[in-house]
Amino acid sequence: MAGLSGAQIPDGEFTALVYRLIRDARYAEAVQLLGRELQRSPRSRAGLSLLGYCYYRLQEFALAAECYEQLGQLHPELEQYRLYQAQALYKACLYPEATRVAFLLLDNPAYHSRVLRLQAAIKYSEGDLPGSRSLVEQLLSGEGGEESGGDNETDGQVNLGCLLYKEGQYEAACSKFSATLQASGYQPDLSYNLALAYYSSRQYASALKHIAEIIERGIRQHPELGVGMTTEGFDVRSVGNTLVLHQTALVEAFNLKAAIEYQLRNYEVAQETLTDMPPRAEEELDPVTLHNQALMNMDARPTEGFEKLQFLLQQNPFPPETFGNLLLLYCKYEYFDLAADVLAENAHLTYKFLTPYLYDFLDALITCQTAPEEAFIKLDGLAGMLTEQLRRLTKQVQEARHNRDDEAIKKAVNEYDETMEKYIPVLMAQAKIYWNLENYPMVEKVFRKSVEFCNDHDVWKLNVAHVLFMQENKYKEAIGFYEPIVKKHYDNILNVSAIVLANLCVSYIMTSQNEEAEELMRKIEKEEEQLSYDDPNRKMYHLCIVNLVIGTLYCAKGNYEFGISRVIKSLEPYNKKLGTDTWYYAKRCFLSLLENMSKHMIVIHDSVIQECVQFLGHCELYGTNIPAVIEQPLEEERMHVGKNTVTDESRQLKALIYEIIGWNK
């Protein structure tokens, strides 16, 4: 508050003013006043103590530790300042320094149990789980002194639950947290711990139940935190990283809910969940929220996503998933050199944050670019290991069912699902090597080898359909794979990818099932009309892309006049149908037409030429703000903004038409 910092404070009012600011949680303003006062009296115990407290509340833990270090030096007889310093260093993730300061207090019986708790927390954060467990059990047994009695039993049980969670014993952690919650009553952080354990054991419904309770109580008890305001479109002020926000566990709950929705492939809901959380400025966001924002908005804003993940990698600490996710995304966007560089520069992170499976998988993906045969062998080794695990787990499920052991069934099924999630990407990476070579029979062979495990998996079925479709003599077989995917979502057909619908329509046409193709197109048209009625400004491309693909098919077969006419009609009205993707399909047909005209391989009627010129004129008019090409997110040399438009490419195509038919002579 500028006025406050610049105003003259009356004599005798300074202390009262500072305490009022602290009472009202206006810590930043208190820091300003205390900083000015300490310039005049740098050894003031009261000033340093209050400044350290304010820094701690502002989560400026390193600065708080500096204040308490000064106090410890000025007043060595008051050992509580050493404890506060150690706690602040721990919060700042400076674990060796925190351990060193805490060790000096171990001989003081008054602080013994608190120091043990702090040391247990430090070891837990450093990943030394046996060391942490030993200290927690020491406290629970009463060896921590008088303070470690009944009051700390709850803390001890929670700590044991956290250790079980870190050890991967999620069911046991759930039991521990649940029992503690029943004994102590509702606590937001404890309820979150339970939800997290349920999430990790894939019990999403139970996790969402506890998340809902955290959110409902947070909204009811603290309406000032503005939950949901950003999603509703209100322009709201940041609530900051206050103690109240931390105590509600709302940020953690929203992040976990977003992760669950993302796992369930409800991507829009996941994005909305992140905007529902209490509003904060970007510089105030915690690492987990920043990581999740990057991940969930990657398709829409990839450049921003990469920047956030790269930034997080420089922080200490960062969410453990950051390293692996950044590498996977580099590979997804085909920045293999960057992925290789990051792996080489961060060998220490490789062993800490990548499982052997993930490291081998990334290594194979990177190798694909220079030595595809070697990469295929690496992927084959991974696939072989995973198929053995799948067979073993299938046998375990069968045995558990025979013995009617529900717990064993659940455990084996969860392990099977996790192994399948590893197997599918390996399989797809193998198939992609042959796909890139347009060797579709070999892609089909790779998929057929995996039918034992994957015949019910949607991703596998979709890609089998694509490879059958691309072989051009297996349209009937492709229909057998596309149809179940479409029928599964028939009531919400626009949830199906437009290219799947287009390929199914083409397959129907190529097998003389024109009635089925027309029925499917009528269904798409009906749903688009309904959506257009509900939201007149919404752009919808499904039927347009289906018609574009059919038009492309006719052009490929040499029937350009019918194909081009279909393409032109598919983009009407232009304000709703013209987009980067639809323009991509349309211009390919026009380029093919112009190539064949320039070689004098085809003759086109003047009326069709006139129709083409008119169409390109409309695209020129409506395509001013539509990118012709979506640029790669990390491209150093960006395309000229004025040239990367549908308008510019329309003009170029029109000029080519004039040149070929001689209108410009």
Curated annotation (Swiss-Prot):
Q: Which UniProt keywords apply?
A: Cell projection, Cilium, Cilium biogenesis/degradation, Coiled coil, Repeat, TPR repeat
Superkingdom of source? Eukaryota
The answer to keyword Phosphoprotein applying to this record is no
**What GO molecular functions are on record for this protein?**
intraciliary transport particle B binding
UniProt signal peptide? none
Primary location class: other
Query: InterPro entries annotated for this entry?
Result: TPR-like_helical_dom_sf, TPR_rpt, TT30
Q: Keyword Lyase on this protein?
A: no
Residue ranges that the Swiss-Prot or TrEMBL entry lists as coiled coil: 508-535
Q: Where in the cell is it found?
A: Cell projection, Cilium
One GO biological process this protein is involved in is: intraciliary transport
Q: Which GO terms describe its cellular component?
A: axonemal microtubule; intraciliary transport particle B
Q: Tell me the ranges holding the TPR repeats.
A: 11-44, 45-78, 154-187, 189-221, 393-424, 425-457, 459-492, 544-577
What the protein does comes down to: Required for polyglutamylation of axonemal tubulin. Plays a role in anterograde intraflagellar transport (IFT), the process by which cilia precursors are transported from the base of the cilium to the site of their incorporation at the tip.
Enumerate the PANTHER family for this protein: INTRAFLAGELLAR TRANSPORT PROTEIN 70A, TETRATRICOPEPTIDE REPEAT PROTEIN 30
| The family this protein is said to belong to | Belongs to the TTC30/dfy-1/fleer family.
Q: How is this protein named in the record?
A: Intraflagellar transport protein 70A
